[in-house]
């Protein structure tokens, strides 16, 4: 059956002399393994567009019983090379597509996840984007779709409102608890140090702001908060939080290298 769908390229590997095996995340079918015959032949008009991180409209010869689907056509929608190559954009890009690839099942359709992924990458591929803030927003939305949204308004132990308590005392005395997930006031419970991370007030404020940010476009604009170390911290924290709650977030070495690049 010939079908059309929008897709994000999650991974590409060489196959034989001139072809590619691709891992795609598609709007209609979820994650698929596909082959692009002649995809590495410079004379093939499709050879340059099926690259990791690209958003495409594609045509497939799809058979549900077949493990690898055949790509017959495609057109580019968005590419991280436009407006130009950028190490920070690429760092965020590969974190995002690796996370989706490693945490989704074959043929596991999720329109909400595809919408999140597509909208994030479309913003990521624009100029003057708050990359770190956008990445933290994506992680917060992603983990919420998995059913592990952290509590950012009330203390996970006492139930008291974080903003009200912080206003009445010294700032900086907050904790982020991996399980149960969310913010906690100091002294509310005896916690395992491996399960808790201290969090500065500006980072807690950013998390709260991102939880109220409904679109990737708004997050890419910084959600009204200047891009800085708080955004980097939130991205790293939420990445660890995702890893804590999900079973298949591999790629530890790759993520560590990219984290170092983004910190420089």
Curated annotation (Swiss-Prot):
Gene3D superfamilies per record: Nucleic acid-binding proteins, Recombination protein O, C-terminal domain
GO biological process terms on file: DNA recombination; double-strand break repair
Keywords annotated in UniProt: DNA damage, DNA recombination, DNA repair
Keyword Nucleotide-binding: no
Cellular compartments per GO CC: bacterial nucleoid
Transmembrane segments: none
Taxonomy, superkingdom: Bacteria
Function: Involved in DNA repair and RecF pathway recombination.
PANTHER family xrefs: DNA REPAIR PROTEIN RECO (PTHR33991:SF1)
NCBIfam families reported for this sequence: reco
Family according to the record: Belongs to the RecO family.
UniProt protein name: DNA repair protein RecO
Organism of derivation: Chlorobium luteolum (strain DSM 273 / BCRC 81028 / 2530)
Gene assigned in the entry: recO
């Amino acid at each position: 059956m010939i079908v059309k769908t929008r897709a994000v390229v999650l991974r590409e590997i060489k196959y034989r002399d001139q072809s590619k095996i691709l891992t795609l995340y598609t709007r209609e079918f979820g994650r698929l393994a596909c082959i692009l015959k002649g995809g590495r032949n410079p004379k093939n008009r499709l050879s340059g567009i099926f690259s990791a991180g690209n958003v495409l409209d594609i045509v497939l010869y799809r058979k549900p019983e077949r493990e690898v689907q055949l790509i017959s056509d495609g057109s580019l929608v968005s590419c991280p090379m436009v407006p130009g190559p950028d190490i920070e954009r690429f760092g965020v890009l590969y974190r995002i597509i690796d996370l989706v690839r490693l945490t989704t099942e074959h043929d596991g359709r999720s329109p909400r996840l595809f919408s999140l992924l597509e909208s994030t990458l479309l913003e990521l591929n624009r100029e003057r984007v708050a990359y770190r803030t956008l990445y933290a927003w994506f992680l917060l939305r992603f983990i919420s779709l998995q059913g592990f949204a952290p509590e950012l308004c009330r203390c996970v132990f006492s139930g008291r409102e974080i903003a009200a308590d912080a206003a009445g005392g010294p700032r900086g005395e907050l904790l982020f608890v991996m399980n149960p997930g969310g913010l906690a006031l100091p002294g509310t419970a005896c916690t395992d140090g491996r399960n808790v991370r201290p969090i500065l007030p500006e980072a807690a404020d950013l998390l709260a702001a991102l939880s109220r940010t409904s679109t990737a476009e708004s997050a890419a604009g910084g959600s009204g908060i200047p891009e800085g170390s708080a955004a980097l911290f939130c991205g790293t924290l939420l990445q660890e939080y995702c890893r804590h709650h999900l079973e298949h977030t591999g790629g530890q070495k790759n993520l560590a290298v990219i984290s170092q690049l983004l910190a420089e």
